[in-house]
């Protein structure tokens, strides 16, 4: 059985978010990329496009399946930094306070499901 997915589904058009569940497409991302990208993302892609950036909560709410990974060797291979990023949307120093685009944070069980 084929399981179609979009790899690096990091910055999506919000209109496309519900299409993942409707079409049975897995949204594959690396949570640590969100915290690596956050310092420059708005300047490079614009505030409007950030509405669909690392949209884990929106994708989950629509019924889409998420697949998480580390993208090693681009990021560290250990899963704990990715779990931390998915739950807090903060970097290793705890920045920004409250998390980047915090409405997209996941619970620990949801983040763990993405990695397993």
Role assignments for model-derived ranges:
Residues 1-4, 8, 14, 18, ...:
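His/Asp/Glu-enriched, well-ordered alpha-helical/loop segment
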């Amino acid at each position: 059985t084929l399981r179609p997915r979009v790899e690096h589904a990091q910055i999506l058009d919000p209109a496309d978010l519900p299409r993942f569940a409707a079409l049975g497409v897995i949204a594959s991302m690396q949570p640590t990329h969100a915290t690596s990208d956050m310092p420059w993302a708005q300047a490079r892609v614009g505030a409007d496009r950030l509405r669909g950036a690392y949209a884990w909560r929106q994708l989950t709410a629509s019924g889409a399946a998420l697949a998480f990974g580390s993208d090693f060797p681009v990021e560290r291979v250990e899963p704990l930094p990715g779990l931390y990023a998915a739950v807090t949307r903060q970097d290793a120093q705890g920045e920004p306070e409250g998390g980047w685009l915090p409405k997209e944070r996941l619970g620990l069980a949801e983040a763990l499901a993405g990695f397993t």
